[in-house]
Amino acid sequence: MKIVFSIVALVGFTLTLNAQTIQDEELRPDELPAVVIKNAGKDFSVYLPDRNPDVRVRQMQDKFVGYNIGKDFEGHDEYIVLLEADESSLVATYNDTGKLIRVVEKYDNVKLPRSVIFSVYKSFPGWVIVKDKFLYTQADGDILKKQYNLKIKKDNDVKRLVVHPNGEIIAGI
């Protein structure tokens, strides 16, 4: 009987010790924050990264978030930062105080969200997506444009569609 109680106590202590192990969960580098706010003199710059499924989009936005404008903007009414990579570009405009005014992003041949793919194939059965572009524009922390421009083809017919990330077809029907 003493042996049974000893074994139960030993197992109980072992389980409680493992339950108290603290694991540090770090932010993975491929996860961007929902909102990036930077101090620009007396103003604040706001940038909203997109949670796009394409790795190239997230990498470009990560580079932009990590970019430090420093004092380069001094002496200019507007200062433009251009980041380019293979089939992608990001253009950011800063004012004379270093505040982020506008960001325009364009990506070609990106991985499309499931909602966009399902919506297009449901609305256009038998058609194939042959080309796509992702456009993302924001000004002063407000998203102005977030859309996919698609080219679809069936036999010799070609159509151009504009699709919202939630799958809503905006134009081209």
Which sequence ranges carry the predicted segments?
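Short, ordered coil/turn segments that flank beta-strands lining enzyme active or ligand-binding pockets
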Residues: 17, 96, 125, 154, ...
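Bacterial Sec-dependent N-terminal signal peptides
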Residues: 1-24
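Sec-dependent signal peptide cleavage junction
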Residues: 17-71
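Long, charged/polar, surface-exposed segments that mediate recognition or autoinhibition
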Residues: 93-132
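Short, solvent-exposed loop/turn elements at beta->coil junctions and helix N-caps
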Residues: 133-139
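N-terminal trafficking/processing presequences and adjacent post-cleavage segments
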Residues: 21-36, 87-108
